[in-house]
Amino acid sequence: MEQTYVMVKPDGVERGLIGEIVTRIEKKGLKIVAGKLMQIDRELAEKHYAEHIGKSFFEDLIGFITSGPVFAMVLEGDDAIATARRMMGKTNPLEADPGTIRADYAIHTNRNVIHGSDSPESAQREIQLFFAPDEILSYQKAVDTWI
């Protein structure tokens, strides 16, 4: 089973979208094996967005992601990374397919509600950045015995 990192950003938390997003994730068949509401500090934000250091939008990005709580999750399932990315939609909500999280809820590219890992390497890095190994649980969903 593949794992991926997904985070409801401050705009999604502040707008009360955690429950809706979790519902969509579970209905899609992905399993949440870790989750926590947390406040990202500048140090963690800089590690998370290290590839953007030096870019013109970096300070705004750090300011936004540290502006309020986020809901961080580790998801597990077949093709979890691609599945989560399809559910999220394109970064720019105006280009996101109807029915995706960003098309339905995001307001602007800079306030696009959700983040998800884009590769197995970034998923592993982000999971290790936000979760200790003992925070990630293994369990069987009730439906698994029927499939």
Curated annotation (Swiss-Prot):
Assembly description: Homotetramer.
SMART domains to which the protein is assigned, alphabetical: NDK
Gene3D superfamilies on file: Nucleoside diphosphate kinase-like domain
CC per GO annotation: cytoplasm
Organism in which the protein naturally occurs: Listeria monocytogenes serovar 1/2a (strain ATCC BAA-679 / EGD-e)
Disulfide bonds: none
UniProt catalytic activity: a 2'-deoxyribonucleoside 5'-diphosphate + ATP = a 2'-deoxyribonucleoside 5'-triphosphate + ADP; a ribonucleoside 5'-diphosphate + ATP = a ribonucleoside 5'-triphosphate + ADP
Lineage: Bacteria, Bacillati, Bacillota, Bacilli, Bacillales
Name of the protein in its database record: Nucleoside diphosphate kinase
